[in-house]
Swiss-Prot record:
It catalyses: phosphoenolpyruvate + UDP-N-acetyl-alpha-D-glucosamine = UDP-N-acetyl-3-O-(1-carboxyvinyl)-alpha-D-glucosamine + phosphate. PANTHER family: UDP-N-ACETYLGLUCOSAMINE 1-CARBOXYVINYLTRANSFERASE (PTHR43783:SF1). Cell wall formation. Adds enolpyruvyl to UDP-N-acetylglucosamine. The keyword Repeat does not apply. This is UDP-N-acetylglucosamine 1-carboxyvinyltransferase. Pfam families: EPSP_synthase (PF00275). GO terms for molecular function: UDP-N-acetylglucosamine 1-carboxyvinyltransferase activity. The lineage of its organism: Bacteria, Pseudomonadati, Pseudomonadota, Alphaproteobacteria, Hyphomicrobiales.
Length: 430
């Protein structure tokens, strides 16, 4: 099993290309099930979760082709992937596939809308709290679906004439449920209005792609999304937006290690709140022609309190990384997690490096220390794993991170991108 070895102490200098967003690519790939035409996606990252979803879509009958594992585009790498779901051969998403990745549950929306039925296993993925599927079920029921859960599967059936447009207000903001209902509603009869919808850039990106396919969606980026159903969708060509979580992660890595790095092929507007927190921590951040420049030279890391919130608030997917940064601050910071329960599993591993963190409910109190010391640590989930890498960049000596398959789910060529900027990071095999 692979591990990541980090020898701390090196500043970061250079250019890091930002990949396409995993959290945007996954729903875009699933949207290909809505049409019998070809959907072409550019800037698709090469990640374990993407490869797993390709297998799942193939199970449903999608024909998938990749133009070049690495297509050189300036200083970045990207893939162009073509999806053609001319014939849906199965409306069942089995446990052995869905259990490996939560987002694969989202196929329930397109399958139900296009085929009138779906049988989808309850999901897997990162073990962060309960992450219930109640909102998906309630929302699809509001569109006329009949749903029952039996033997670990969600069995959904549309009315004889197809799904029916309706109104549904999410009791809490859910990005995944917003994706699913928006996709399902594109082929429903009549108009659907989603209230308290997620406003994340990935939702806006999905709506942009669906509209290019012939959908009639408005209000994306606000808390009320309106979808006027159409009879069918066509193919389209769409470029996946930059990964704001990867952008924020590398910005925090520079703030932690010190240095001067340009993050290319990304946009500051995708993560304003997170970048402001990094500025307050002591980094200088400025826009470039094609990205963002992060500088921290000499100045220490200042303590900053943050609370995770749905977009445009501080992203929960950057909470662990920011905690890693705060372990070296010059004071006390408080990090409150409001999106997911049980998302502090990285705390005890950071403590192995010398961090001083105490928990009280959904808030972590981080007392900055003057030095961290390398140690063997274990990744517990995707975002927690990269927080250990960030801490390792500033730790004295060697940090060895095990269970790095978590990293491979969401970070494309992480060790390569850090190494090209001067970090001592390498993948080793047992």
């Amino acid at each position: 099993m692979d591990r990541i070895r980090i020898v701390g102490g090196n500043e970061l200098h250079g250019v890091i290309p930002i990949s396409g967003a995993k959290n945007a690519a996954l729903p875009l790939m699933i949207a290909s099930l809505l049409t019998d035409d070809t959907l072409t996606l550019e800037n698709v990252p090469h990640l374990a979760d993407v490869e797993q979803l390709i297998r799942i879509l193939g199970n449903h009958g999608a024909d998938i082709s990749v133009n070049g594992r690495r297509e050189r585009q300036g200083e970045s790498y990207a893939r162009t992937v073509h999806f053609t779901s001319r014939n849906i051969v199965s409306t069942t998403a089995p446990y052995e596939l869905v259990s490996k990745m939560r987002a694969s549950f989202w196929v329930i929306g397109p399958l139900l809308a296009r085929e009138g039925r779906a049988r989808v296993s309850l999901p897997g993925g990162c073990a962060i709290g309960t992450r219930p599927v109640d909102l998906f079920i309630e929302g699809l029921t509001a569109l006329g679906a009949s749903i029952e859960i039996d033997g670990g599967y969600v069995n959904a059936t549309a009315p004889a004439g197809g799904l029916i447009g309706g109104r549904y207000t999410f009791p809490k903001v859910s990005v995944g449920a917003t994706h699913v209902l928006m996709m399902a509603a594109t082929l429903a009869n009549g108009t659907t209005v989603l209230g308290n919808a997620a406003r994340e850039p990935e939702v806006v990106d999905l709506a942009k792609c669906l509209n290019a396919m012939g959908a009639k969606i408005s209000g994306q980026g606000t808390s009320t999304i309106t979808i006027e159903g159409v009879r069918s969708l066509s193919g389209a060509r769409h470029r996946v937006l930059p990964d704001r979580i990867e952008t924020g992660t590398y910005a925090m890595a520079v703030a932690m290690a010190g240095g001067d790095v340009i993050l290319e092929d990304t946009e500051a507007s995708l993560l304003d709140t997170a970048l402001e927190a990094i500025r307050r921590a002591g980094a200088e951040i400025s826009d470039t022609n094609n990205g963002i420049r992060i500088v921290r030279n000499g100045a220490g890391i200042r303590p900053v309190d943050i609370v995770t919130d749905p977009f445009p608030g501080f992203p929960t997917d950057l909470q662990a990384q920011f905690m890693g940064l705060m372990t070296r601050s010059s004071g006390v910071s408080h990090i409150t997690e409001t999106i997911f329960e049980n998302r502090f599993m990285h705390v005890q591993e950071l403590a192995r490096l010398g961090a001083k963190i105490s928990l009280s409910g959904q808030t972590a109190k981080v007392e900055g220390v003057s030095r961290l010391k390398g140690a063997p640590v274990m990744a517990t989930d995707l975002r927690a794993s990269v927080s250990l890498v960030i801490a390792g960049l500033a730790a004295e000596g060697e940090t060895m991170v095990s269970r790095v398959y978590h990293l491979d789910r969401g970070f494309e060529r992480l060790e390569e991108k850090l190494t090209r900027c001067g970090a001592h990071v390498e993948r080793v095999s047992d």
